[in-house]
A protein has these predicted regions:
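Positively charged n-region of N-terminal signal peptides that target proteins for export
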Residues: 1-5
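Bacterial N-terminal signal peptides
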Residues: 7-17
Length: 168
């Protein structure tokens, strides 16, 4: 009987790590700042996933405590997140900064005020090179309502649609 209990406990203990983190999800919100009119991009990711990706990229352990951490993070985000205007021209986002707690990291970018983002193309490949199951959701909040783009390794870009839904 003791052997059966021991084996059952052993199985539970050995499967816990596999259950700990089985999904890979990132969230970006695009919205206008009501005070400045600037278009704000707020990216939220699991800190451990970002550290893992940047460690893999650099070939050494990445930590936000390192002197060059913000520069490395900025380069990685800039290389993997982009927007193109309706004319297909890549638009440079201004780096605002980042903050993190023990679980999450938030990265902030912005654009000067825009008439709208209708027809703009958004590309987000953050963490795709590290986790094949990564899903990046982009929420757009503006005068056209709230909507989302779902990006995966197979679908890395999408277009911001601004058609208001009719309530007929």
């Amino acid at each position: 009987m003791k052997a059966k209990v021991f084996i059952a406990l052993l199985v539970v203990v050995l499967t816990l790590p596999a259950l700990a983190h089985r999904y890979f999800f990132g969230l970006t919100e695009i919205s206008s700042n009501l005070n400045t009119g600037a278009v704000e991009f707020v990216h939220q990711y699991t800190l451990h996933d970002v550290q893992h990706a940047l460690s893999k990229l650099a070939g050494e352990r990445f930590s936000l405590d390192k002197e060059n951490a913000e520069a490395v993070l900025k380069r990685w985000v800039t290389d993997n997140f982009s927007v193109k205007n309706v004319d297909g021209k890549k638009v440079e986002l201004t780096w605002v900064g980042f903050e993190a707690d023990y679980q999450k990291i938030w990265v902030y970018q912005e654009l000067p005020a825009q008439k709208n983002l209708c027809g703009w193309e958004v590309s987000n490949t953050l963490l795709f090179d590290t986790f094949s199951a990564q899903v990046n959701t982009i929420n757009i909040v503006d005068e056209y309502g709230n909507r989302s783009l779902i990006l995966t390794d197979e679908n890395r870009t999408d277009i911001i649609n601004c058609q208001k839904e009719s309530k007929d």
